[in-house]
C-alpha cells in the first residue's frame, strides 16, 4: 500500500494519509445496493450497538468466498478499494468468461494468475482443500463448513497457519491466537490478506471517521451518574469502584463474553489470546 502525504496548511489534510494507488471503479453486475436500516438500533428504535450512525452511502461488492470455479485459471485485472471491508479486492477474469471479485492476497499484482481446485500448486492466491496443503502453509479465507465459503481470516493482514493434520481434521492457528480443529475437506486460500498497513493509516480529522459510519466515543468518567457507573463526582474524580464496568454494570475487563455451551467448544484446543 502506497501512502500519500499532503503538504498543506490545514491540520486535517496535514495529518491525514491517503492510499494513492488503489481506486474504486466496480463492475455494475457485481454490485448491488443495500438498505441501511437501524444505525445501531433495534425494531423499537432503541440503541443496541453504540457509536454507529451516519456514514457515506455504499454499494455492496459481491465477493467470491467459495472459490468454486474449479480448475479454471483466472487473471487479476484490477485491485480495487472496497468500502465494506478494510481489505482490498481483486477483479478476476476467468478463462470461461466468468468475472468475480476475491480478497486481494498480499503481494499479488495485476496480471498474476490464480486457480482453485484439488492438487493445484501451492501458490499465493490459489484455493484448495486443507488436506492437499503441506504443514506450515500460511492461509486465509478459511471455510468452517464445507461448501459454505470462507469465514475465517478475512480482514486486512489476516493470516492463519496450518500446524497439524490428523484423521478427518486439520489443526489451525488463527490470527487471534486460537488453536482449533477444522475438517480437512474445507478449502482455504494460500497466502495473507493484503493491505497489511491499514493500522498505520491516519484519518487526520473527525469527519473522516464520520464518513465511515462511526460516531464519537465518550468516556464514562465524564458522564453523569445516571448515564454511567463511572460518572459523577466533583471535578476530575476516579471511577469510585474497584474495577471498571460497562455502562450496564458488568465487569469491563477480563470477563469472558463468549456464549456458553456452543457446539464448537470441543473443536477449540486453545483459547484466543487477549
Curated annotation (Swiss-Prot):
SUPFAM superfamilies: Nucleic acid-binding proteins, Translation proteins SH3-like domain. InterPro entries: NA-bd_OB-fold (IPR012340), Rib_uL2_dom2 (IPR014722), Ribosomal_uL2 (IPR002171), Ribosomal_uL2_bac/org-type (IPR005880), Ribosomal_uL2_C (IPR022669), Ribosomal_uL2_CS (IPR022671), Ribosomal_uL2_dom3 (IPR014726), Ribosomal_uL2_RNA-bd_dom (IPR022666). It comes from Solanum lycopersicum (Tomato). NCBIfam families: rplB_bact. Gene3D superfamilies: 2.30.30.30, Nucleic acid-binding proteins (2.40.50.140), Ribosomal protein L2, domain 3 (4.10.950.10). The lineage of its organism: Eukaryota, Viridiplantae, Streptophyta, Embryophyta, Tracheophyta. Belongs to the universal ribosomal protein uL2 family. Residues 1-25, 224-274 are annotated as: Disordered. Residues 7-25 have a biased composition (Polar residues). One of its GO terms (biological process) is mitochondrial translation. One of its GO terms (molecular function) is RNA binding. It comes from the Eukaryota. The gene is rpl2-A. GO terms for cellular component: chloroplast; mitochondrial large ribosomal subunit. Keywords: Chloroplast, Plastid, Ribonucleoprotein, Ribosomal protein. This is Large ribosomal subunit protein uL2cz/uL2cy. Part of the 50S ribosomal subunit. It is found in: Plastid, Chloroplast. Pfam families: Ribosomal_L2, Ribosomal_L2_C.
Amino acid at each position: 500500500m502506497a501512502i500519500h502525504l499532503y503538504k498543506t496548511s490545514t491540520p486535517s489534510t496535514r495529518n491525514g494519509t491517503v492510499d494513492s494507488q488503489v481506486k474504486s471503479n466496480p463492475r455494475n453486475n457485481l454490485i448491488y445496493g443495500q438498505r441501511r436500516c437501524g444505525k445501531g438500533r433495534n425494531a423499537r428504535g432503541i440503541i443496541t450497538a453504540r457509536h454507529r450512525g451516519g456514514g457515506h452511502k455504499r454499494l455492496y461488492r459481491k465477493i467470491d468466498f467459495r472459490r468454486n470455479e474449479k480448475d479454471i485459471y483466472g487473471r487479476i485485472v484490477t485491485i480495487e478499494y472496497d468500502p465494506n471491508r478494510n481489505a482490498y479486492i481483486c477483479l478476476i477474469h476467468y478463462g470461461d468468461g466468468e468475472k468475480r471479485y476475491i480478497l486481494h492476497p498480499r503481494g499479488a499484482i495485476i496480471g498474476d494468475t490464480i486457480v482453485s481446485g484439488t492438487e493445484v500448486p501451492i501458490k499465493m492466491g490459489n484455493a484448495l482443500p486443507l488436506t492437499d496443503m503441506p504443514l506450515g502453509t500460511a492461509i486465509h479465507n478459511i471455510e468452517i463448513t464445507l461448501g459454505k465459503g470462507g469465514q475465517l481470516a478475512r480482514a486486512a493482514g489476516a493470516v492463519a497457519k496450518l500446524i497439524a493434520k490428523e484423521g478427518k481434521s486439520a489443526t489451525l492457528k488463527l490470527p487471534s491466537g486460537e488453536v482449533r480443529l477444522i475438517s480437512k475437506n474445507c478449502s482455504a486460500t494460500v497466502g495473507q490478506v493484503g493491505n497489511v498497513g491499514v493500522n498505520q493509516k491516519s484519518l487526520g480529522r473527525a469527519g473522516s471517521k464520520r464518513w465511515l459510519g462511526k460516531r464519537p466515543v465518550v468516556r464514562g468518567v465524564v458522564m453523569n451518574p445516571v448515564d454511567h457507573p463511572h460518572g459523577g463526582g466533583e471535578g476530575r474524580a476516579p471511577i469510585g469502584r474497584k474495577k471498571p464496568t460497562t455502562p450496564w454494570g458488568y465487569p469491563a475487563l477480563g470477563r469472558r463474553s463468549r456464549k456458553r455451551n456452543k457446539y464448537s467448544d470441543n473443536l477449540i484446543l486453545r483459547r484466543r489470546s487477549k
